[in-house]
């Protein structure tokens, strides 16, 4: 369960950094 949230959060953070 937390794995899915972690993956989405990771993509979100990458978009914010860019």
Curated annotation (Swiss-Prot):
UniProt keyword Lipid biosynthesis present: no
ATP-binding is among the record's keywords: no
Signal sequence, renumbered to the chain: none
Listed GO MF terms: DNA binding
GO cellular component: nucleosome; nucleus
Subcellular location field: Nucleus; Chromosome
Keywords noted in UniProt: Chromosome, DNA-binding, Nucleosome core, Nucleus
Assembly and binders: The nucleosome is a histone octamer containing two molecules each of H2A, H2B, H3 and H4 assembled in one H3-H4 heterotetramer and two H2A-H2B heterodimers. The octamer wraps approximately 147 bp of DNA.
Described function: Core component of nucleosome. Nucleosomes wrap and compact DNA into chromatin, limiting DNA accessibility to the cellular machineries which require DNA as a template. Histones thereby play a central role in transcription regulation, DNA repair, DNA replication and chromosomal stability. DNA accessibility is regulated via a complex set of post-translational modifications of histones, also called histone code, and nucleosome remodeling.
Record family assignment: Belongs to the histone H4 family.
Protein's name according to its UniProt entry: Histone H4
Organism: Pseudotsuga menziesii (Douglas-fir)
Lineage of the species this protein comes from: Eukaryota, Viridiplantae, Streptophyta, Embryophyta, Tracheophyta
